[in-house]
A protein has these predicted regions:
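Bacterial Sec-dependent N-terminal signal peptides
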Residues: 1-22
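Ser/Thr- (and often Asn-) enriched beta-sheet segments in non-cytosolic proteins
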Residues: 18, 45, 73-78, 84, ...
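Accessory beta-strand-rich segments of carbohydrate-active enzymes
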Residues: 21-37, 44, 53-55, 97, ...
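Mature N-terminal segment immediately following signal peptide/propeptide cleavage
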Residues: 37-56, 62, 66-81
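Generic domain-boundary/flexible-linker signal
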Residues: 61, 85-88, 135, 179
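Surface-exposed, low-complexity/disordered Ser/Thr/Gly/Pro/Asn-rich loops and linkers
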Residues: 77, 81-99
Length: 190
């Protein structure tokens, strides 16, 4: 009898899967987008020549996103970068976060627009900003993330200046001091 009941349920399984598949297809029909729609995409590697500053008690009230901020004394580096890894080992950091103190940092980069960008959508694509992150362009906050293991796209288009330099500023924080299952790192890491 037990074998008959199991066989009966196994026969019904494909019916349930088929019904669920049909329900999914009704809700989200496939859209065919011709490849030529993507032919005009241009990718620019933006990883080099960033400025970085760790937030400290002395500078924590600074408007790091301001386009007029003098960042000439900041450290120049290339991305990806993990600022928490550079911090000293400390017991107060807690074992759950790799014995590193929680901290915040800012990245900045100035750039002119390419004349070919005018009239086009310009996206800055981050693979990950750990752990919390905000992106500013010319002093305006344009994107945020509260989970660094997912990518973040920041649409620069409405905020770009085509007449001069643009300043992108990225805030990254390792988040509040609380438990974690592993060392998370901090910064623009991919």
């Amino acid at each position: 009898m037990k074998n008959i009941i199991i066989a009966f349920f196994l026969m019904l399984a494909p019916v349930g899967v088929t019904a669920q598949y049909q329900k999914t297809q009704e809700k989200a029909p496939l859209v065919n987008v011709p490849l030529e729609n993507f032919a005009s995409q241009q990718k620019v590697l933006f990883n080099f020549g960033w400025k970085f500053q760790l937030v400290t008690n002395e500078n924590k009230n600074t408007d790091f996103a301001s386009p007029t901020l003098d960042d000439s004394s900041w450290r120049t580096l290339d991305l990806p970068h993990d600022f928490q890894f550079e911090q000293p080992w400390t017991e107060s950091g807690g074992g759950a976060r790799g014995f590193k103190p929680m901290c915040e940092g800012w990245y900045r980069k100035s750039f002119p627009t390419d004349p070919s960008w005018k009239g086009k959508r310009v996206i800055l694509d981050f693979g990950g900003i750990i752990y919390l992150g905000d992106v500013y362009l010319n002093g305006t906050k344009i994107a945020s993330t509260d989970y660094g293991y997912v990518g973040l796209e920041a649409d620069l288009t409405p905020f770009l200046s085509h007449d001069g330099e643009n300043v992108v500023a990225v805030y990254a924080s390792t988040g509040p001091k609380k438990g974690s299952r592993w060392y998370t790192g901090g910064g623009v890491f991919r």
